[in-house]
């Protein structure tokens, strides 16, 4: 069980870093389209 957590932790951290970047990129694209 501990091995599963050890492999999931890095994935969760990466997702936590990537998702906000993707959201900000989407917002920029939407604002560009509106303008």
UniProtKB/Swiss-Prot annotation:
Going by the UniProt record, its keywords in alphabetical order are: Toxin
Q: Which domain of life is it from?
A: Eukaryota
Cross-linked residues for Cyclopeptide (Ile-Pro) are 11-20
Any one Gene Ontology molecular-function term assigned to this protein's record: toxin activity
The propeptide segment or segments lie at: 1-10, 21-35
PTM entry text: Processed by the macrocyclase-peptidase enzyme POPB to yield a toxic cyclic decapeptide. POPB first removes 10 residues from the N-terminus. Conformational trapping of the remaining peptide forces the enzyme to release this intermediate rather than proceed to macrocyclization. The enzyme rebinds the remaining peptide in a different conformation and catalyzes macrocyclization of the N-terminal 10 residues.
By sequence similarity, the record places it as follows:
Belongs to the MSDIN fungal toxin family.
Q: Report the function annotation for this chain.
A: Probable toxin that belongs to the MSDIN-like toxin family responsible for a large number of food poisoning cases and deaths.
NCBIfam families the record matches: amanitin
Query: What is the designated name of this protein?
Result: MSDIN-like toxin proprotein 1
The organism named in the record is: Amanita rimosa
